[in-house]
């Protein structure tokens, strides 16, 4: 055999071996790809693979578990894993889920949002120091906490009134603004139910009289703006049921008498100008009179601006049953004796006569009775 034939046979043998090995290698690659469905040679969850159908471990920045894997694979892989913690945009975490850039609760919504809110409460808006819960401008507390200026149920009067945390000293209920008292405390101008008068009048009168500003109640009640009683109008303003108690303590020392402007007391002294039913008179008259200047039973409203009887109009104004008693300690003599400065001027039944008149036309029981009854610098039985 020649040398040329040997070369041909050797070349054919080498070529067959080379092509056989090449075919085997290429076939293996194709088979592997068709079996695992992956260009990277990854199997089920094999390490180093990025986002198979069942969530392998991420190959990119964060490797970490589930970086875009799971059902959100594909786009979630790579960078989403490392930074996102819980996964990529499509995974459990990411910007939208529990993890994301913020981790933990994170900025993400969904379930992560809820948990984040709770923890964020505390010092924040959820309550505590921040307001929200206990406080709030409209709540029981207020911006500053405690009771505060907050409105709503219990602000001032109402249920909060009784206890009077805001009362007495402050303004709240009970003794405060909304309750028996007024703006300044004990009595005063306070509005609302029992503001001065009404139910609050009774008790308010006794204690709040003499010393305090408002007497029995507030502007509408037994007490008034100035002294023991005051100007308070309305039913029971000074007089009425509240008069009795209010008169006693408030009468003696204080300015006002049994009631307010419409009641036993007046602007200045024991009784006053008050007209209307029971103005100075009534049950409250007795206590309000005596020392304070008003007559025994309130002589025509307890008296006028100055003394015992006075200008009081309406039933029993000036004279009447209170005429005689109007003398008493404060009547009879002096400018205000028996009547007020305008004593006897009052019209109606039982009109007082003259200045300081002790005796009046149509005088009731005790007419002309008292220390100065029947005397005084004024004389005559003539009224103007």
From Swiss-Prot:
One annotated GO biological process: cell wall organization
Predominant localisation class: secreted
This protein's UniProt keywords: Cell wall, Cell wall biogenesis/degradation, Repeat, Secreted, Signal
Signal sequence extent: 1-27
GO CC terms of this entry: extracellular region
Keyword Lipid metabolism in annotation: no
Localization in the cell: Secreted, Cell wall
More details: This protein contains 67% glycine residues. 90% of the mature protein residues are capable of forming a beta-pleated sheet composed of 8 anti-parallel strands.
General function of this protein: Responsible for plasticity of the cell wall.
Protein name: Glycine-rich cell wall structural protein 1
């Amino acid at each position: 055999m020649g040398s040329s034939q040997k070369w041909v046979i050797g070349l054919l043998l080498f070529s067959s071996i080379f092509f056989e090995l090449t075919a085997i290698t290429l076939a293996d690659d194709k088979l592997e790809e068709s079996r695992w469905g992956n260009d990277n040679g990854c199997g089920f969850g094999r390490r180093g693979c990025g986002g198979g159908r069942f969530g392998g471990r991420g190959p990119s920045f964060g490797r970490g578990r589930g970086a875009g894997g799971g059902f959100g694979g594909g786009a979630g892989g790579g960078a989403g894993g490392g930074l996102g913690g819980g996964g990529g945009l499509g995974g459990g975490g990411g910007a939208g889920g529990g993890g994301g850039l913020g981790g933990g609760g994170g900025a993400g919504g969904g379930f992560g949002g809820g948990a984040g809110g709770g923890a964020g409460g505390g010092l924040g808006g959820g309550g505590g120091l921040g307001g929200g819960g206990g406080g709030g401008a409209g709540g029981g507390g207020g911006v500053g906490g405690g009771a505060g200026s907050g409105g709503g149920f219990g602000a001032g009067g109402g249920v909060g009134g009784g206890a009077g945390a805001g009362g007495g000293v402050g303004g709240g209920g009970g003794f405060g603004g909304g309750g028996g008292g007024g703006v300044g405390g004990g009595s005063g101008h306070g509005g609302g139910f029992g503001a001065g008068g009404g139910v609050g009048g009774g008790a308010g009168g006794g204690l709040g009289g003499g010393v305090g500003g408002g007497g029995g109640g507030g502007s509408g009640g037994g007490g008034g703006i100035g002294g023991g009683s005051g100007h308070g109008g309305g039913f029971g303003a000074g007089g009425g049921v509240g008069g009795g108690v209010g008169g006693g303590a408030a009468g003696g020392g204080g300015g006002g008498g049994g009631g307010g402007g419409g009641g036993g007391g007046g602007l200045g002294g024991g009784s006053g100008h008050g007209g209307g039913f029971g103005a100075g008179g009534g049950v409250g008259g007795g206590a309000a009179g005596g020392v304070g200047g008003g007559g025994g039973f309130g002589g025509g409203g307890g008296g006028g601006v100055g003394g015992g009887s006075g200008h009081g109009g309406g039933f029993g104004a000036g004279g009447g049953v209170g005429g005689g008693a109007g003398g008493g300690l404060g009547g009879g003599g002096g400018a205000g004796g028996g009547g007020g400065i305008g004593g006897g001027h009052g019209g109606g039944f039982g009109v007082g006569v003259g200045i300081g008149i002790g005796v009046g036309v149509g005088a009731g029981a005790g007419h002309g009775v008292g220390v100065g009854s029947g005397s005084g610098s004024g004389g005559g039985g003539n009224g103007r």
